């Protein structure tokens, strides 16, 4: 990354960082997509088992990965402040934290997974597939968490194309391994959906090893000498990392787990309603990738400028990123409005589900408009290391406003299932307003400091 002089240079640098992040996020989601689709070719039970296992794992992973993503703003600010000598120590401490988190997940997971699956009252065959899928997947938890740290380090230097290429290389690896273990090719036993867990675990080891060699051998990463000096574990550094990482992790967890909670609360509705809701929610999740990518890019560039005490530039980046996300959101809103029948048709051919999905997509339209404001502001605030407010905003907007309002409207009015979407939209909109005022207040404070 480099210092920019005008808005045109800022837009160019932001896009240079943003586009690879977007492709990376899409690539990571495709791994889960491949697991689910290829497992579904074996049997409905395999599809259900993998889908349930993935739905349990995703909130846990995204929340804990959020903790490790604290590396991005920390390293970006060290880079901006020209304190490069502190970066290897910071990255290695994050790897130690990744190892501790891996151990914690393995211990708790092995103790609790049977209990959790038992509470879901699943068919015994589906229960066993989900259990063993998660068991095999757990073999890749440590490399996945270490990769998250290494990816955050690479991204913080503005070299997001590198992580993009690593992620894209993982897709054919995952596809081939799925083919081998799910269907039993090249002398391997046919494990069905369970094999998708093993394939994903081995894929995580591959991308971790690839990242390690890139950091060790290729400039500019090799210039930092990561892993050349094995620093001792530091509780102080760990606490500093967790001080920023825990609020990020919990905020991400609150965001991802709310959708699972809504789906569970909607379980008493007709199958057609649930299927339509899931289709619209899946499409909304796909649209969320862009504001999420803008958010991650803003964390990098705002952190870089804030670390260099160029607060005016940090503010400009924030505004550009927010406007970029809103512009894309308005475009996708128009597409939903005009092509909602075709969008619904990608998910189903059932006429009842098709009709109802189109109605849900109208709510998805307003949902993603709120996301376009909230997500980039969260990223900008994290660039300033202002993470506690984003945690509070995520909790209040989803769990204090969104879910209760959704439950009340969905249960006690004629809107039914649509009420849950109204609740989520109301909560997210309220959170976006709160985040906007927080960012404005923070930037005003830093602007005053710059003029002193």
From Swiss-Prot:
It holds the Pfam family MatE. The keyword S-adenosyl-L-methionine does not apply. GO terms for biological process: monoatomic ion transport; response to antibiotic. One of its GO terms (molecular function) is xenobiotic transmembrane transporter activity. CDD domains: MATE_NorM_like (cd13131). Keywords: Antiport, Cell membrane, Ion transport, Membrane, Transmembrane, Transmembrane helix, Transport. InterPro entries: MATE_fam (IPR002528), MATE_MdtK (IPR050222), MdtK-like (IPR048279). It is a multi-pass membrane protein. It is found in: Cell membrane. One of its GO terms (cellular component) is membrane. It comes from the Bacteria. The chain crosses the membrane at residues 14-34, 56-76, 97-117, 129-149, 164-184, 195-215, 244-264, 284-304, 319-339, 360-380, 392-412, 417-437. Belongs to the multi antimicrobial extrusion (MATE) (TC 2.A.66.1) family. Multidrug efflux pump. This is Probable multidrug resistance protein NorM. It comes from Bacillus subtilis (strain 168). The gene is norM.
């Amino acid at each position: 990354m480099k210092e920019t002089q005008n808005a045109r240079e800022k837009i160019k640098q932001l896009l240079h960082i943003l586009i690879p992040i977007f492709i990376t996020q899409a690539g990571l989601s495709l791994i889960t997509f491949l697991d689910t689709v290829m497992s579904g070719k074996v049997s409905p039970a395999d599809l259900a088992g993998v889908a349930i296992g993935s739905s349990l794992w995703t909130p846990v992973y995204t929340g804990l990965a959020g903790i490790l993503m604290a590396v991005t703003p920390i390293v970006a600010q060290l880079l901006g402040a020209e304190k490069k000598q502190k970066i290897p120590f910071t990255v290695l401490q994050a790897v130690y934290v990744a190892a501790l988190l891996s151990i914690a997940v393995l211990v708790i997971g092995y103790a609790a997974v049977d209990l959790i699956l038992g509470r879901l009252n699943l068919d015994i065959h589906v229960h066993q597939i989900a259990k063993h899928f998660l068991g095999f997947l757990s073999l890749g938890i440590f490399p996945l968490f270490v990769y998250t740290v290494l990816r955050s380090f690479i991204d913080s230097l503005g070299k997001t194309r590198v992580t993009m290429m690593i992620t894209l290389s993982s897709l054919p690896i995952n596809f081939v391994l799925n083919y081998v273990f799910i269907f039993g090719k090249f002398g391997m036993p046919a494990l069905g959906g369970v094999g998708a867990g093993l394939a994903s675990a081995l894929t995580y080891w591959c991308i971790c090893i690839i990242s390690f060699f890139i950091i060790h051998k290729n400039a500019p990463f090799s210039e930092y000498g990561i892993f050349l000096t094995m620093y001792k574990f530091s509780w102080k550094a760990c606490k500093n990392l967790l001080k920023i990482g825990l609020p990020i992790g919990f905020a991400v967890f609150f965001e991802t787990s709310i959708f699972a909670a809504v789906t569970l609360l909607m379980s008493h509705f007709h199958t057609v309603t649930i299927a339509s809701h899931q289709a619209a929610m899946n499409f909304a999740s796909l649209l969320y990738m862009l504001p999420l990518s803008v958010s991650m890019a803003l964390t990098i560039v705002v952190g870089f400028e804030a670390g260099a005490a160029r607060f005016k530039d940090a503010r400009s980046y924030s505004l550009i990123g927010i406007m970029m996300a809103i512009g894309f959101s308005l475009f996708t809103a128009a597409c939903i409005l005009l092509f909602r029948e075709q969008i619904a048709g990608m998910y189903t051919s059932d006429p009842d589900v098709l009709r109802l999905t189109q109605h849900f997509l109208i709510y998805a339209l307003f949902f993603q408009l709120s996301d376009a404001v909230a997500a980039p502001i969260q990223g900008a605030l994290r660039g300033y290391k202002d993470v506690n407010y984003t945690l509070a905003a995520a909790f209040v907007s989803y769990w204090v406003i969104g879910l209760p309002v959704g439950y009340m409207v969905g249960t006690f009015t004629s809107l039914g299932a649509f009420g849950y979407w109204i609740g989520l939209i109301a909560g997210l909109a309220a959170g976006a307003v709160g985040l906007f005022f927080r960012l404005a207040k923070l930037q005003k404070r830093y602007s005053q400091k710059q003029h002193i």
